């Protein structure tokens, strides 16, 4: 099993030193789901929400969150992201919204946390915009779908999960 990279020999948390790592193209994708009543989802899809375009706001929030991940997650490095993309899709058959984020850069550390943060904050934004009409909205699951680049190799979630 791999060792925890953010814990030193004394058991103390620290930020990993990436200065000796090679710069490679790194990419990560994550997803989040927001489940709600069919009436709430219809209001979003039909553009009838009194707060405005829920998907556009969630998309911008997710992009902004990816860029600020290093301020939210204590041991993350500040990164120069070259791409952040947020896709939102209504899934009326499940009364939910599926959010998929993509983050990319050429650098010395991965972008998994940025992708996860982007999807999570986009989901939280949907909740925030819809909580006046429905308080029992459910967020989750949130998960990493894939990552590529870097020394640890590629990862892709099993298609059956």
UniProtKB/Swiss-Prot annotation:
Q: GO molecular function, one example?
A: cyclic pyranopterin monophosphate synthase activity
This protein's UniProt keywords = Lyase, Molybdenum cofactor biosynthesis
**Organism, scientific name:** Salmonella typhi
The EC code for this enzyme is 4.6.1.17
Which positions does UniProt annotate for substrate binding?
Answer: 75-77, 113-114
- Gene Ontology terms describing biological process: Mo-molybdopterin cofactor biosynthetic process
Kindly give the InterPro entries that the UniProt entry links to this protein: MoaC, MoaC_bact/euk, MoaC_sf, MoCo_biosynth_MoaA/MoaC, Mopterin_CF_biosynth-C_dom
What reaction is this protein's catalytic activity? (8S)-3',8-cyclo-7,8-dihydroguanosine 5'-triphosphate = cyclic pyranopterin phosphate + diphosphate
- The active-site annotation reads 128
Name this polypeptide is given: Cyclic pyranopterin monophosphate synthase
Its assembly, as annotated, is:
Homohexamer; trimer of dimers.
Q: What does this protein do?
A: Catalyzes the conversion of (8S)-3',8-cyclo-7,8-dihydroguanosine 5'-triphosphate to cyclic pyranopterin monophosphate (cPMP).
**Pfam families assigned:** MoaC
Q: List the pathway annotation.
A: Cofactor biosynthesis; molybdopterin biosynthesis
Matching entries from SUPFAM superfamilies are given as: Molybdenum cofactor biosynthesis protein C, MoaC (SSF55040)
């Amino acid at each position: 099993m791999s060792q925890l990279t953010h814990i030193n020999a004394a058991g103390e948390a620290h930020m990993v030193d990436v200065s000796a790592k090679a710069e490679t193209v790194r990419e990560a994708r994550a997803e989040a789901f927001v489940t709600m009543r069919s009436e709430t989802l219809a209001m979003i899809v039909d553009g009838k929400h009194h707060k405005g375009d829920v998907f556009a706001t969630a998309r911008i929030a997710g992009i902004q969150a990816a860029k600020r991940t290093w301020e939210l997650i204590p041991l993350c490095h500040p990164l120069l992201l070259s791409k952040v993309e947020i896709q939102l899709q209504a899934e009326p058959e499940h009364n939910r919204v599926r959010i998929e984020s993509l983050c990319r850069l050429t650098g010395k550390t991965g972008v998994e946390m940025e992708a996860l943060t982007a999807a999570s904050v986009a989901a939280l934004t949907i909740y925030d915009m819809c909580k006046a009409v429905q308080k029992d909205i459910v967020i989750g699951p949130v998960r990493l779908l894939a990552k590529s680049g870097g020394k640890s190799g590629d990862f892709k979630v099993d298609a059956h999960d």
